[in-house]
């Protein structure tokens, strides 16, 4: 079984271009050649991934049958002269296999998609993908005795079944990434099956795979959503930023060449074209190593590794290369005497791409969204100064103001870490909980708790880093968390404020949410006593269970009075804590809550005017 890594591609975000053109808008040639195809393709695994991701509810038996059927079709189509990996219109062939099955379309609600053709059919299937379908339970690794026996009896079948289980639960996860994770799992099984404590061995060694699986799945979905929602120009800027930070010695033309090809790979991976996604991933990783002398001095040891899997992982974790000597510290008067407003659209895009490249290679520790905000601010500055009496003087003054984007992000990181140091992770989450219940009161309590728990956990992790790394850590994590919130809004609209922040500007999404205070359109529901009834289980609960109960009370309180002030909130919390202390110390806890609880709520309603 051939395993190929693609995590390297996760780092190299990109913009969408058609591969058949083999050059981007600036005439830069592609390193990918669509006339080439790989004979070394494990089509069983790739077809399994495709069908499991596009028909998530299908059983393994059903997926296995579709795999067998489509391989027969492919062999007939390509003949003996060409490898199966050369099949054209691969996605169409795979989708046709789903639709021509007698029971599959009707059983799984696919008839509407199957009634369409071409791109419409493909887009219909893509829109059906669900990140966490309720009908599919979380994956549980079988207990060691069963796993080890099944693995020993038929390793290929065991691993294909594992790939099926992962793919159907993570429909946005790139095919090469699934194969990479399966390769890691394949390696831990033999030693763990021989271990004295097999259960502990599997739990310990599978933990890192599970973590990488979860993070990669979220990241792949995030990238595909950004590509779809914000388009080519934004994705190009993201890619140029990341590549320029990773390879600061590479010239602009080389960066643009990589942008084009990594872009195509992401496009194919996001659209579920598993064969081309995998083939092109190999080529880009190989190309990076072939150009290591001009790209980076940090990947030499990586490129000596024997397998693509090891090579790719090594490059991912390699440090950003050192900045070239003689690089000027700033980009004053970057355009020189040229009038920005007189440039064509193509020239403007090229100028901004080059500015982003130059700025990124000078600031390897800044988060991508921060650099994009600087670039956006710089373009606005150029447009404004082109209309002034003294454009160059205007630029000189304005370029100093670009630091405000970095300073705003630094101030937020400092403020958040200050809160963490003062309050700890739980109370930091409560602060986020109050803020985001006001911003998005339409979210359910479990959604609000899950969202803010991620924020608090991220804050704790980032704040333990050195000060120069806190900013990139926090901004990067916030981008992903907000991205998940925006996916939720796309599926089920939350409110106009959230919608505005999610769709207006990728670079400014986080600042937009930071400045969003209240949903002015929200009307609190009529007061319900049922949401504020206290029982003795508050005294019996401990740890996470008790914290969850308290947070539920906090959410209900803020939803009832979104305009609640910090002073009012502190007073209510103090009264609530007093109630717990009084009733939990007594013998008749339930009686105490029944008597004192309503009194507390009456006092709270009077003070808040609800």
UniProtKB/Swiss-Prot annotation:
Chief site of localization: secreted
Signal peptide per UniProt: 1-18
Listed SUPFAM superfamilies: Serum albumin-like
Record: glycosylation sites: 251
Disulfide bond sites: 99-114, 113-124, 148-193, 192-201, 224-270, 269-277, 289-303, 302-314, 385-394, 417-463, 462-473, 486-502, 501-512, 539-584, 583-592
List of residues that carry Phosphoserine: 111, 115, 117, 345
UniProt domain Albumin: residue ranges: 19-210, 211-403, 404-602
InterPro entries: ALB/AFP/VDB (IPR000264), Serum_albumin-like (IPR020858), Serum_albumin/AFP/Afamin (IPR021177), Serum_albumin_CS (IPR020857), Serum_albumin_N (IPR014760)
Localization of this protein: Secreted
Binding site for Cu(2+): 22
GO biological process: apoptotic process; homeostasis of number of cells; immune response; ovulation from ovarian follicle; progesterone metabolic process
Top-rank taxon: Eukaryota
Tissue expression summary: Plasma. Synthesized by the fetal liver and yolk sac.
Pfam families in the cross-refs: Serum_albumin
CC terms in the record's Gene Ontology section: cytoplasm; extracellular space
Keywords for this protein: Copper, Disulfide bond, Glycoprotein, Metal-binding, Nickel, Phosphoprotein, Repeat, Secreted, Signal, Sulfation
GO molecular function: metal ion binding
Assembly: Dimeric and trimeric forms have been found in addition to the monomeric form.
Record family assignment: Belongs to the ALB/AFP/VDB family.
Role description: Binds copper, nickel, and fatty acids as well as, and bilirubin less well than, serum albumin.
The protein's name: Alpha-fetoprotein
Lineage: Eukaryota, Metazoa, Chordata, Craniata, Vertebrata
The encoding gene: AFP
